[in-house]
Swiss-Prot record:
Claim: Membrane is one of the keywords in the record: yes
Membrane topology recorded in Swiss-Prot or TrEMBL: Peripheral membrane protein
Subunit structure: Interacts with A56 protein.
Family: Belongs to the serpin family. Orthopoxvirus OPG040 subfamily.
Organism of derivation: Vaccinia virus (strain Ankara) (VACV)
Induction comment: Expressed in the intermediate phase of the viral replicative cycle.
Gene: OPG040
Functional summary from the UniProt entry: Prevents cell to cell fusion via its interaction with A56 protein. The A56-K2 complex associates with components of the entry fusion complex (EFC) presumably to avoid superinfection and syncytium formation.
Name the UniProt record assigns to this protein: Superinfection exclusion protein
Localization (cell): Virion membrane; Host cell membrane
GO cellular component terms attached to this protein's record: extracellular space; host cell plasma membrane; membrane; virion membrane
Pfam families for the chain: Serpin
Key words of the record: Host cell membrane, Host membrane, Membrane, Protease inhibitor, Serine protease inhibitor, Signal, Virion
Coiled-coil features, chain-numbered ranges: none
Length: 369
């Protein structure tokens, strides 16, 4: 059996304009082929959305299509996005922090209308040829607490514009695993069988068997304490088929199918960190913004900018107490009943989800914990 783990932020009917936003991040994830993966669909989609705001011409048309938006829906969708971010409240047990920064070179002429509308979200002017890496890292760390987000491989003397967003999540399980019951156990993947620390909890959770086409998957929801954020775990024989089936709407539908059951749940502790060049993935969705001849960001500047680099760094740690996950996404532009036993002892995928808004914060796959 192969397992799927989903940590996510759910789409409600009131945020229908943002289902395309969520789906863009899911599609990006599906184009990653590594074994152990941690990825932030929200971080990816947020960067694409914020590059849509200054875009024009074919660049705007492609980005609107990526977000499944009509031109007249862009303003309302932006309002809904900001409203959704406000719902990610920090509590005594859960900390969620999102930041956005747009760094523009001093030589680029920003239109006053764009500056007036968006500068409050984090618009900075600087000289990219004078210690830009340290200056940007200092600003991002001051705002997010995350250090060394960019390096000299991401920025160079050609850089004129950099979009950076960060996400940090720390959540305590509503029903923590008992650390005294963690035992070494077998975990089997395509490479063979290994011994891993397996956590254990017996408690009432929401779960069910869901059917996709003719295939069945056992799914269970692990809530975080006082957060409206949950981790969804699923296990079945064909997780590639499960992953291919994921959309924002289907995640909503599956979550509504879950009912209360008592589980004896076993889940391995795991930690994953990825640093990934995601330009080729974004280029499949909106190719013109990466083309020096076709890119247009004329709602921000008349300077002929185009995106030439895009990265995402992400990591996640899951243990008996809860989850810590963080990600930074960087776009760089230049000119031009009785306890039911459920053991995750084979590879699984994860998604992090806020059960109100529908934004998927983190998603990934564990082949070898």
């Amino acid at each position: 059996m192969i397992a799927l783990l989903i940590l996510s932020l759910t789409c409600s009917a009131s945020t229908y304009r943002l289902q395309g936003f969520t789906n863009a991040g899911i599609v990006a994830y599906k184009n990653i082929q590594d074994d152990n993966i941690v990825f932030s669909p929200f971080g990816y989609s947020f960067s694409m959305f914020m590059s849509l705001l200054p875009a024009s011409g074919n660049t705007r048309i492609e980005l609107l299509k990526t977000m499944d938006l009509r031109k007249r829906d862009l303003g309302p969708a932006f309002t809904e996005l900001i409203s959704g971010l406000a719902k990610l409240k920090t509590s005594k047990y859960t900390y969620t922090d999102l930041t956005y920064q747009s760094f523009v070179d001093n030589t680029v002429c920003i239109k006053p209308s764009y500056y007036q509308q968006y500068h409050r979200f984090g618009l900075y002017r600087l000289n990219f040829r004078r210690d830009a890496v340290n200056k940007i890292n200092s600003i991002v760390e001051r705002r997010s607490g995350m250090s060394n987000v960019v390096d000299s491989n991401m920025l160079d003397n050609n850089t004129l514009w950099a979009i950076i967003n960060t996400i940090y999540f720390k959540g305590i399980w509503q029903y923590p695993f008992d650390i005294t019951k963690t035992r070494n156990a077998s975990f089997t993947n395509k490479y063979g069988t290994k011994t891993v620390p397996m956590m254990n909890v017996v408690t009432k959770l929401q779960g069910n068997t869901i059917t996709i086409d003719d295939k069945e998957y056992d799914m269970v929801r692990l809530p975080y304490k006082d957060a409206n954020i949950s981790m969804y775990l699923a296990i079945g024989d064909n997780m590639t088929h499960f992953t291919d089936s994921i959309t924002a709407a289907k995640l909503d539908y599956w979550s509504f199918q879950l009912g209360n059951k008592v589980y004896n749940l076993k889940l391995p502790k795991f930690s994953i960190e990825n640093k990934r060049d995601i330009k080729s993935i974004a280029e499949m969705m909106a190719p013109s913004m990466f083309n020096p001849d076709n890119a247009s960001f004329k709602h921000m500047t008349r300077d002929p900018l185009y995106i030439y680099k895009m990265f995402q760094n992400a990591k996640i740690d899951v243990d008996e107490q809860g989850t810590v996950a963080e990600a930074s996404t960087i776009m760089v532009a230049t000119a031009r009943s009785s306890p039911e036993k459920l053991e995750f002892n084979t590879p699984f995928v994860f998604i992090i989800r806020h059960d109100i808004t529908g934004f998927i914060l983190f998603m990934g796959k564990v082949e070898s914990p």
